[in-house]
Amino acid sequence: MPELRYRSRSYKRIFKKTPGGRTVTHYRRKKPSKHVCAGCGKPLHGVPRGRPYEIRKLSKSKKRPNRPYGGYYCSSCARKVFKKEARS
């Protein structure tokens, strides 16, 4: 029986074969879902997905695209926002 904390499905079960021939279960935290555009819901490019402790280690330029609304809107939706701002 696994430990109580590993019974939850927030852990991914990885089955590993040991050199002795036994199969053991390793528990690993699942990866977070991809970031999506606030406008259209498409997955964003250039935004890494990982647990907070992994993202913390990255430099600022690797965390999100370096442009206005980077990491929030996809390029096509950002273009629409720029046009709307310029016209108003």
Curated annotation (Swiss-Prot):
Name of protein: Large ribosomal subunit protein eL34
Family to which the UniProt record says this protein belongs: Belongs to the eukaryotic ribosomal protein eL34 family.
Keyword ATP-binding (UniProt): no
GO CC term, one of those recorded: ribonucleoprotein complex
Matches recorded under PANTHER family: 60S RIBOSOMAL PROTEIN L34 (PTHR10759)
Matches recorded under Gene3D superfamilies: 6.20.340.10
Coiled coil: none
Keyword check for Ribosomal protein: yes
Gene Ontology MF term list: structural constituent of ribosome
NCBIfam families: PRK04059.1
Matches recorded under InterPro entries: Ribosomal_eL34, Ribosomal_eL34_C_sf, Ribosomal_eL34_CS, Ribosomal_L34e_arc-type
Native source species: Methanothermobacter thermautotrophicus (strain ATCC 29096 / DSM 1053 / JCM 10044 / NBRC 100330 / Delta H)
Keywords: Ribonucleoprotein, Ribosomal protein
GO terms for biological process, alphabetical: translation
